[in-house]
Amino acid sequence: MKKLPLFLLLLVCLLCCGKKKAVEELSPGHTVTIQAGDIKAVFADNTEFGVHRAWYNGVAFLSHKADTVNIFRPRVAGLNFEHIFDGQKWWEPAEVLFEPRACPMSIQRISDRTAELHQGPTSLHKLESWTRFTVTDPHYIDMEFTCIPRAETFDRGYIGLFWASYINTKVDKGYYFIGRKTVEDQKQWVEINSPAHNIESSVRYELDERDPGFVEGYPPRLFNNYMDYRYSYPFYYGRRGKMAWMLMFEQAGPVRFSHSPTSGAPVGPGTEPAWDFHYLFYDYKVGEKYGFKARLVYKPFVSREDIIEEYENWSGEKVEMP
């Protein structure tokens, strides 16, 4: 038997080694798995698979080399597009209350680092949206959300959108931001750890004086109950064990932070928190594009100075603390 020339052997070796192994999806057509840098993420549409429940679009799984356990509760998700609201209509049944979850949604892999969710005009508010997730070295998920209102259905002139992240922890339920009660006060680190679901559950920007308005009798929700403190910079972080989970946004004002100590359950032992946010787009016009960019950071916690540095490097803004 003839031996292959050395250069041919090297060529075969290079071709074999350079060939990427195909990712086996948890639910083909409904999930996109991306492993890059230090993190692994599974993005999902509204379809049920395995232990993962239907309606929980977003990031179904997120782990880090330093902690391979899912940061999110296994049956649900993080960065889950949960509510569309206008302050006027009160929703029932659940299919309307959780409109982005209940309406059809598709997912596709854009590249080896990017997945995109698409939802056609929804049943009640006729809002079409695209959510693009890109995994960036070494420990980031960049999120870009775009939406277009296809009809004049938001009765009070603004578009309200809400995202939930269900954290897999029973301790350290609060998260932290830099803020103050008034602009005359000194900035400080503040923890939001609301006493119960829908009580003192959201945080506004310190210069945000616009009131979206809710019709009289509108039930209490996470997005219409506020704590006294306001945030000074559009980022917050929480901790699970040795890990830090951080969200930062490109623009202060339209984004408001939200929190639930129990993810909607009654207060009690064994409950797990939700570290949420919502966006408000005022004076909307049918057919116009609206959106935002955000970055999720997931890595071992180093210090609060390191958290600030992450935000400064990404935003280009200098954080000033006393």
What are these regions (language model features)?
Residues 52-116:
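An extended acidic
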Residues 140-194, 304:
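Acidic (Asp/Glu-rich), glycine- and aromatic
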Residues 174-221:
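Glycine-rich (often Gly-Gly/Gly-Pro-rich) flexible segments and glycine-rich loop motifs
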Residues 14-16:
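C-terminal motif of bacterial Sec signal peptides marking the signal peptidase cleavage site
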Residues 2-9:
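Sec-dependent signal peptide recognition
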Residues 19-79:
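Beta-strand-rich N-terminal accessory domains
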Residues 22-37, 208-322:
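Beta-strand-rich recognition/accessory modules
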Residues 87-140, 147, 152-154:
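Extended, loop-rich substrate-binding clefts of extracytoplasmic carbohydrate-active enzymes
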